[in-house]
From Swiss-Prot:
HAMAP family: Phe_tRNA_synth_beta1. The keyword ATP-binding applies. InterPro entries: aa-tRNA-synth_II/BPL/LPL, B3/B4_tRNA-bd, DNA-bd_dom_put_sf, Fdx_antiC-bd, Fdx_antiC-bd_sf, Phe-tRNA-ligase_IIc_bsu, Phe-tRNA-ligase_IIc_bsu_bact, Phe-tRNA_synthase-like_B3/B4. Pfam families: B3_4, B5, FDX-ACB, tRNA_synthFbeta. This is Phenylalanine--tRNA ligase beta subunit, chloroplastic. It comes from Pyropia yezoensis. It is an enzyme of class 6 (ligase). Residues 625-718 form the FDX-ACB domain.
């Protein structure tokens, strides 16, 4: 795919329609940087298996020489290879070549200027910032070598200063802004400059990117020179201050902004640029310095300009990242290789050479262990022992290791956990619920972040199953469909004392549709609390689990879905296993629903605990009574905060051998009953195993029961 057709030829803040994962790479430039004599361009296998993919190869003639242009893609975690320097490091490691000296010596005395023209007012979300004022420049035509480098990378010449900034970004991966100071309001040779990065306070702020007006808001980080908004931080510079052939005085900026802030601005504005792609993935401090020094050297050399003042703000990097590497673990994970028809493991010297080629410093080593220091530009993706082992395999070549399936004796019997999950799934399907399956990766922040996400938008492990079920119902509603009574059984992740714990959860979502009828003659209604709770209780009953429903608060991420005052915490064997609740109003508004939705999420690991499962039921078998039952209803006025479960437990003390069951059938709350009071309806079912009970016998029993309720429980009977 020739993605460079999307480039706007004149600027380095090129607006693109791609994710920025592809680069056009000049083979001649790559060989020059890496001191590489030959590369087999027809054999893409080694590059593809080394973490990069060559999408296409094109041969062109530039400056009278044949050059091969490679379309290369890399993974999201390899921000260090979004530059020719980074790629040349990789190719040098793969081919065993040595890199040329990359360090750029700063121009003599550029930091010893006596003038203090540039002042730092407030650099928000920016820890590393270079700036320099260069005067008396003459913008001439770009030299041929510079034009050729840009042309081979898909850029077209515009003017010398823009070409230099594009060249530096391609070579070092560090965006450079060059601002025409003659276009800054109220700016002359003697004025001082105040630089800042901040969020705009005005409501009508605008900026021109690529000559298009962009509306700003308080969530967009911008940079300013004096009172002029010169760029959207990390994304692109203001077209009003672009350089041209009449430019005489410039401000050269290079900065590293906070990745999350640039990513947020890019999403809000729906703009992806060469600069934002690199800022989002993370920039390297060493490259930042070298890029700025080389930019100043090129500008002063090619424009004959004079550096008037400089400013630098640098965050001191943390201590070196050291990783202990076990040779035995390398052999255990990677396995043996085939060498000259024989099977053997990697030699210690081979591992050493690979680490040296990757610029990993070896600070301690013996035949069993190596302690390595990871270079700064690889600290984003290499910070564990397994990462170092992966690098060894990648450079040596995955295809050189023997591929064999281990001989494992599988136990054909299903585990207790698998049986329990299958049973739960079967019960829920029998109850009429639809099973859904979602990814374990989510967009939400605040969860457990992946170290190596393939897609930045899905870089967190889920801590709950509810978000997936809610999003599925939201999608159905947007497609003019109904909500689905559904469930999901899957793994969730959470931190427990700095350890990542994985559990198997069950989540259910119920309601939302006007399809519940008591009989065909009654109008349809939406699911209410008691009906939803009844479905959940039915599920637990079929699992043979006695669940306690309480009002204990829950403080995890699910609290954002809870409707205040309409939730219950579920307890099994004195352990909180989950929550049942009505969805809150905010979620209703998001879904566009007028009817109620209820959800359940429980930890199946606790429910499945085989130690708590009865192997033999403790029931006593007795024949059903052949005599009819008689029902009596009773209305009581009780405190509003009294739980029905507690009341039924109190009534159990009034034992009557003919009382078969006591159930709640009604609840009524009104000011006429009394403040902090509610009326409930209880249904008492009487049945004898010995005879048919008469009405007079039942009336007497019921009268005695009412007297005990009034006297002993101090409750009022509603007439």
């Amino acid at each position: 795919m020739n993605f460079l057709n999307y480039f706007y030829h004149s600027k380095k803040i090129l607006l693109q329609k791609i994710d920025g994962q592809f680069m056009k790479v000049s083979l001649n430039w790559l060989k020059a940087l890496g001191n590489i004599k030959t590369i087999d361009i027809d054999n893409k296998y080694s590059t593809n298996t080394a973490g990069f993919e060559v999408e296409a190869i094109e041969s062109i003639i530039i400056g009278g020489e044949i050059d091969h242009i490679l379309d290369i893609s890399s993974t999201a975690n390899r921000s260090d290879v979004l530059s020719m320097i980074g790629l040349s490091r990789e190719v040098s490691a793969l081919t065993g070549s040595s890199m040329f000296q990359l360090y750029i010596n700063p121009i003599i005395d550029i930091f010893s200027k006596k003038e203090t023209i540039i002042s730092n007012h407030d650099l928000l979300n920016c820890d590393n910032y270079f700036a320099a004022i260069i005067d008396e420049i003459r913008v001439k035509d770009s030299p041929d070598w510079l034009k050729n480098r840009l042309l081979s990378s898909g850029f077209t010449h515009r003017n010398l200063l823009t070409d230099i900034s594009n060249y530096i970004m391609l070579k070092w991966g560090q965006p450079i802004n060059i601002i025409d100071l003659n276009k800054i309001n109220n700016m002359n040779h003697k004025n001082s400059l105040t630089i800042r990065s901040n969020f705009p306070l005005g409501s009508n702020d605008q900026i021109k990117l690529n000559n298009e007006n962009i509306e700003l808001n308080k969530n967009i980080l911008v940079t300013q020179v004096n009172t002029n908004v010169t760029s959207i931080a990390g994304i692109g510079s203001n077209s009003d201050f672009d350089t041209d052939y009449n430019t005489k005085s410039i401000l050269v900026e290079s900065a590293i902004f906070k990745q999350s802030v640039v990513r947020k601005s890019s999403r809000v504005l729906n703009i992806r640029t060469e600069s934002s792609i690199r800022q989002e993935r993370g920039l390297n401090v060493d490259n930042w310095k070298n890029a700025h020094f080389e930019a100043l050297a090129l500008i002063t050399d090619l424009t004959c300009g004079n550096i008037r003042d400089t400013f630098c703000r640098e965050k001191i990097t943390d201590h070196a990242l050291n990783i202990n590497l076990s040779i035995k673990k390398v052999h255990d994970i990677l396995g043996p290789i085939m060498y000259n028809g024989q099977t053997r493991f990697l030699f210690f010297e081979e591992i050493q050479n690979i680490l040296h080629s990757l610029n990993f410093d070896l600070i301690y080593q013996n035949k069993e262990n190596i302690e390595v220091t990871v270079p700064n530009y690889r600290r984003e993706d290499v910070f564990r022992e397994i990462d170092v082992i992966e690098e060894i395999a990648r450079i040596y070549g995955y295809h050189k290791f023997r591929s064999s399936v281990p001989n494992i004796q599988f136990n054909k019997r299903l585990s207790t956990k698998r049986k329990f999950i299958d049973k739960s799934r079967s019960i829920l399907r029998n109850l009429g619920l639809t099973e859904l399956v979602h990814y374990s990766l989510i967009k939400s922040k605040g969860n457990i972040a992946l170290n190596n996400p393939l897609i930045q938008d899905y870089s967190n492990l889920r801590g709950s199953l509810l978000e997936g079920l809610i999003e599925s119902n939201l999608y159905n509603i947007k497609q003019s469909n109904q909500t689905i009574d559904s469930f999901e059984i899957g793994t969730v992740f959470h931190n427990d004392q700095n350890k990542i714990v994985e559990t198997t959860n069950l989540a259910i979502i119920l309601g939302g549709n006007l399809d519940i009828r008591s009989t065909w003659s009654h109008p349809a209604h939406s699911l209410n609390w008691y009906e939803a709770k009844g479905i959940v209780e039915n599920f637990f009953q079929r699992l043979n689990r006695q669940i306690e429903w309480t009002k204990k608060d829950i403080l995890d991420g699910r609290i954002k879905f809870i409707q205040k005052g309409k939730f219950a915490t579920l307890i099994y064997n004195n352990i909180i296993i989950g929550i049942f609740s009505e969805l809150n109003q905010a979620t209703y508004s998001e879904l566009g629903l007028n009817t109620k939705l209820f959800f359940l999420e429980v930890n199946l690991n606790i429910l499945e605990d085989c130690h708590n499962e009865f192997n033999y039921l403790s029931y006593q078998i007795q024949p059903y009574s052949k005599y009819p039952s008689i029902i009596r209803d009773l209305s009581l006025i009780i405190p509003k905060n009294m739980e029905i479960k507690y009341l039924l437990k109190l009534l159990d003390q009034f034992y009557d051998k003919d009382l078969e069951s006591t159930t709640l059938f009604d609840q009524y709350i009104d000011e006429s009953i009394g403040k902090e009071k509610k009326s409930i309806g209880l249904r008492f079912t009487y049945r004898s195993n010995e005879k048919t009970l008469t009405n007079s016998e039942i009336d007497y029993k019921q009268h005695q029961l009412q007297k005990k309720i009034v006297k002993q429980l101090n409750l009022k009977i509603r007439q």
